[in-house]
Amino acid sequence: TGVQTCALPLYPDDPLPPLVKAGLAHVQFETIHPFLDGNGRIGRMFITLLVEHWGLLDQPLLYPSVAFKRRRQEYYARLAAVRTDGDWERWTAFFLDCVKDAADDGARVAQAIHALMGRDRARVVHHERATITAVKLLDLLPSNPVLTVLRASELLGITAPPARKAIDLLEELGVLRETTGKQRDRVYAYHAYLELLTES
C-alpha cells in the first residue's frame, strides 16, 4: 500500500542518517498522498514522530512546519523537483536546512520560556500574599497553560478555595488571564507562555 511504501527508507539496517531518512519518508508520503484530506499536516507530523521514534529526541519537540511555511515556495518547488527530476540531493539539503531552522527556533523558544518562568516565579515569590500553592500552580502551568479552578484544584490535590486564591494571585500579577469574560465557569490562560509557543 501507499503507507507501506513510505516506510521503505525507514528500515533499521539502512545506513542513511535518521534525519535524511525522515526527509525521504516525508517526500514519499507527500507524493503518495494516501488520505483524502490532511496529508500535509500528517506528513509534517510524521517527521516529528520519526525523529522521536529513532531516539534523536526524548519528546516530539521538533516542528519543521514553521520553517517549511517560511519557505513555502521553495518547499513545493523542491518536492516537485524530486517527483519530476529525481532531485533528491537538493530536497535533502533543503530539508536539513529547515530542520536546523526548526531546532534553532525550538532553542530560542525554550530559552524564552525559561526566562519567562524565572521572571514570573520571582514576581510570585516576592509578592506579599505569596503562597506555596501559588508557586506550585505556576510550576504546573507549562503543562497546563489553560485551566479552571476545578482543574487547578485537581492538579494541586486541594479543595477549590485555596486553588481559587492561587489563581486570583496569578491573575492579579498578570501571569494568568481570564478568557471567557463570565462570572461562572471561568477559564484562565497562561497567555505569555502561549504567545511564545504560537509566535514561532
Model regions: which residues?
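The short coil/loop that forms the "turn" connecting the two helices of the helix-turn-helix
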Residues: 157-158, 176
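Conserved alpha/beta core segments of nucleic-acid transaction machinery
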Residues: 98-129, 133
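Short hinge/loop at the helix->beta-strand junction immediately C-terminal to the helix-turn-helix recognition helix
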Residues: 146, 172-178
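Short, cationic-aromatic polyanion-contact patches
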Residues: 130-131, 178-200
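Phosphate/pyrophosphate-binding active-site loops
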Residues: 7-111
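Basic amphipathic alpha-helical segments that dock to polyanions
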Residues: 141, 163-173, 188
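Positively charged, low-complexity/disordered segments
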Residues: 1-6
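Short acidic, hydrophobic short linear motifs in intrinsically disordered regions
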Residues: 138, 143-156
